[in-house]
């Protein structure tokens, strides 16, 4: 359980202090659940004329469960207009994890699975794969409105999911469609390199300090022995050092290898 002070600093206090919404057949609760659903679905404003009145009616009459209601919303034209048509595929998958399972993707294999699923079976199969999953059933069941779970320790949750949740959650009042980076995926590099993401606070994107794999500001000292360039005899080879940023470390090592140089040591600068 996260302390109220930490929750306030990290920007998710409203979620930490609010119990999950369990839907029952009353108009007041349906209205509250509808607000929470679209708060989870990107926190984007839904006009009265855009509301899915037929789905609401089915829910209020008890003909469908909350899970079916969420399915109808996620497969609706409204959801597609907000998060699918103008959004890159990987970013769309990130948002589906956030909206429908309440967490961020853990690793690249989850992204690859959903890319292949959409390519082979289409949009509806992609949405159904989250809602029909065992994870959804265990977390929300038939009557609980999906909510953000990535801020708390959950059974079977990977620790890295906590950090990654803050990459795709940018504050309580933020909308997924208003984020400046909405036109590209947020986690591509960290997932591809299997790195833990920095925790970004909602205020001005300030990163919290600490030992985090993949710190983009870290410099490394690379010591190499130069190639002999075809000489048959050599008494001594000189050792050269390079100061390289984290982002340039891999390309630099590739270039040195192509030149025939031998890396003898890599250490933080």
From Swiss-Prot:
GO terms for biological process: photosynthesis. InterPro entries: CpcD-like_dom, PBS_linker_dom, PBS_linker_sf, Phycobilisome. It is found in: Cellular thylakoid membrane. The keyword Acetylation does not apply. Residues 217-269 form the CpcD-like domain. Pfam families: CpcD (PF01383), PBS_linker_poly (PF00427). It comes from the Bacteria. GO terms for cellular component: phycobilisome; plasma membrane-derived thylakoid membrane. Residues 2-177 form the PBS-linker domain. It is a peripheral membrane protein. Keywords: Antenna complex, Membrane, Photosynthesis, Phycobilisome, Thylakoid. Belongs to the phycobilisome linker protein family. Rod linker protein, associated with phycocyanin. Linker polypeptides determine the state of aggregation and the location of the disk-shaped phycobiliprotein units within the phycobilisome and modulate their spectroscopic properties in order to mediate a directed and optimal energy transfer. This is Phycobilisome 37.5 kDa linker polypeptide, phycocyanin-associated, rod. It comes from Microchaete diplosiphon.
């Amino acid at each position: 359980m996260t302390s109220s002070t930490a929750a306030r600093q990290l920007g998710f206090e409203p979620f930490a202090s609010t119990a999950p919404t369990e839907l029952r057949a009353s108009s007041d609760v349906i209205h509250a659940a509808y607000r929470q659903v679209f708060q989870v679905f990107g926190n984007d404003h839904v006009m009265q004329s855009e509301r899915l009145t037929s789905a609401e009616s089915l829910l209020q009459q008890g003909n469908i469960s909350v899970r079916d209601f969420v399915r109808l919303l996620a497969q609706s034209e409204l959801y597609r207009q907000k998060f699918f048509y103008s959004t890159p595929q990987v970013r769309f998958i990130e948002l589906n994890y956030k909206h429908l399972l309440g967490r961020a993707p853990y690793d690249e294999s989850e992204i690859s699975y959903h890319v292949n699923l959409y390519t082979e079976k289409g949009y509806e199969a992609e949405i159904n794969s989250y809602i029909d999953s065992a994870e959804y059933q265990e977390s929300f069941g038939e009557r609980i409105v999906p909510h953000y779970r990535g801020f708390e320790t959950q059974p079977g949750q990977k620790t890295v999911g906590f950090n990654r949740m803050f990459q795709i959650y940018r504050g309580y009042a933020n909308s997924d469609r208003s984020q400046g980076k909405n036109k590209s995926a947020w986690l591509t590099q960290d997932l591809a390199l299997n790195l833990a993401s920095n925790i970004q606070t909602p205020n001005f994107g300030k990163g919290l300090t600490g030992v985090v794999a993949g710190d983009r500001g870290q410099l490394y000292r690379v010591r190499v022995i130069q190639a002999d360039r075809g000489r048959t005899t050599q008494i001594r080879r000189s050792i050269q050092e390079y100061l390289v940023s984290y982002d340039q470390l891999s390309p630099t090592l590739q270039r040195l290898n192509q030149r025939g140089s031998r890396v003898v040591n890599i250490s933080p600068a």
